[in-house]
Structure formats: C-alpha cells, structure tokens
C-alpha cells in the first residue's frame, strides 16, 4: 500500500490539500451565510418565517454583488433565505446544490415580504464572520460561523446552547495539516510532488474535472461578463492569436465567468475560494494538454499548483484587500513551470516575477469582474514562466521582491496583513456608499 511510503510531512501536505481544495457551489462568502441559515433552520421543527443575519465587513464586501446560483439574484439576503428554505446544512460549501425551484420561489417571496435582514456585525474582530438567526413561530435558532467559511462555532436555540466550539481550537490549528505549512518551504513541497506515489494524489484530478466543466460552460453561455467567450470571438476575427497564451487566458476566464455569473455547477475551490481554485487549476490543465501530459503528470502539476497556492495563502488573512487570484496564480505558475522543465529555480523565479508584477491588485468584492482579475493573473503567471524558462526574473534589487522566493512571499503577505488593512476599510466604505 502506498501509505507505507508516505512520511508524516507528506501526509500533512495531502491532508492540507484535502481540507482546502473542496467543491463549492456559488461564491463562498454568501454561501457561508447560506450555510449558517441552513444549519439554523435544521434546528427548528417548523418552516422558517423570518431571518436576521449579521456579517463581518469583509464578508459583506464579498457578498454584495455576486449572483447566487439558481436564483438570478445577487447579494446576501437571497443567499440567507435560500439557505434557510432549501439548503442542506450537511453539504458544506455545496449547501445550495439541491435547492428546488419551489425553495427559490419561496426565498424570493420571503425577500419581497421584507422578512430578511442582513446587517454588519459591529464591532467585529473577525475577518470572516457570519451569523444567521431564523424564526418559526415562537421558536428561533442561531448559528455563528467564524474564521473559515464552514467553521460553525456556536449553535443556540430558544431552548439553550446546542453546540459551542472547544476553547482549544486555536491550539489544535497549530498542529493541524495547515499549521504544518508554517514550518515548511517550496523546496519541500516540490520534493513531495516529485516523489509521492501517484495513487496518493490521484484525487486532485477532480479539480480538473470540475473546473474544466465550468470553463466549458463559460464558453457556451453568456455568464457574467462573458470574457472567455468574447475573447474567443476575437480569435475568430483575427484580433487575437490562437496560441497557448490565449488558450490559457480564454479558458481560465471562462470558468470564472460561469462561476461568478451564477452557473449551477460547482467549482473546485482553493483556500475557501472558487476563483482561487479555478486560477490554480485551469492554466495548468491547458499547459498539460499542450505538452501531452498523462494523468500522473497532470496530477503532480495540479498538486504543486494547489499546494503552493495554499502555502502562500496560509500566510494571508482569510479575506483581505489583496486579490487572492494573484496568489493562486503563483501556484499555477509553479505547476506550469514544473510541466515544462521541473526545476526549482524556474518555479522560484516565476513566483518572484509574479510578486513583482501583480502584487498590488485589490479585492473590491466578489462580482462578475473577478473574472477580469482571474484572467489577468493567469496571463501574468504564464508570462512569468516564459521569462523564468530563459533564466530571467524580477530580482531582489527591485521593489518588494527579495533575493529568495520565500522572503518575497513573506514581503507580499506582510502588505496584506498590515499596510493593506486601511485599503480594505476604504474599499468597504466606497462600496457601502454605492449601496445607499
């Protein structure tokens, strides 16, 4: 059995990917609130009649302008209502996957009657916070999610507290597979990818299946800003070359188009984000097809991409002013570089050039325009790989890029953790002013 060949560090890598790379239907911030509402509704015997919800500013930012799958509507109120009336609390990020047409109609009716209120949680010390309190007659139930999109920390009803997360949860995090990433390096990740038995990582091919299907859907329909299908038309008009670079751009943006436009297909997410999962997957798939990679090579490249993206994102807040499609694309750069020449130096140079290129891109909330940023990040990743293949990269003499890739990553993440906090507040203020 392959288990005997896997050391504890490698096992932690595999578990980290299994924990962070999951199917998700719909943008994960409104889905987090939908999950809270579904979990609260599951505690009641009767039908939910009213919902009060509270979210953190960052969750509000990412939930204001994005379409909830199957509804044709944007925003947190419809997500909360559909979660309460048609959600499956056991399905995690796919909480809305089995929502019926009747549940959608009932959710819209609940909104029209003014029985759904979504408010900012103030004060709020948590980047990711969602709380849903649902009412049925004289009964109520309240569920709170903190820190991660599916991390339920408290369940309470009018009869008392049903569940509360253990106080030692933070200590357990340090020893978790994700906690191990704080003490590893890209070199160790590459060594793992090169040597781990294929059967142990075969599961990552599901990312190619799910995100590939989203890409195809994006090219077929007019989802979101339909960037992918629009650029494909420009190829037919002779305004864009039909080459590998364009294929990466079109197929990656098409998947994000479908994702953000409300397609009822799941994305394989990364670090709690469907767009990050798309960005870490589709460019690698396109290059793998170009070089004729078999399933094993594709799986290793995808594992390198996703694990590198998780490794970088683990040094960031769960939500921030930094567009994390950029960090996911750094993972994609690693995966694409590995497919072509496999050298650590090429991978490190590509990531460093990415940090010198797109590190200033802001996150101004989840919306159709995320597909623009996904396509920009994917294109930048391929450009960085092409440079690295010729031993060219942004060097430690320039900007925030350091003389080694690990310090470059640390420099980038320090911006999001500290100096970009004020940027985040300003973005939220601007978006809130537009809502009035």
Swiss-Prot record:
InterPro entries registered for this protein in UniProt: Ser_deHydtase-like_asu (IPR005130), UPF0597 (IPR021144)
For this entry, list what GO says about its biological process: L-cysteine catabolic process to pyruvate
Per its record, what are the GO molecular function terms?
Answer: L-cysteine desulfhydrase activity
Q: Which HAMAP family match?
A: UPF0597
Q: Which family, according to UniProt?
A: Belongs to the UPF0597 family.
Protein name (Swiss-Prot/TrEMBL): UPF0597 protein YhaM
Organism expressing this protein natively: Salmonella gallinarum (strain 287/91 / NCTC 13346)
Gene name per UniProt: yhaM
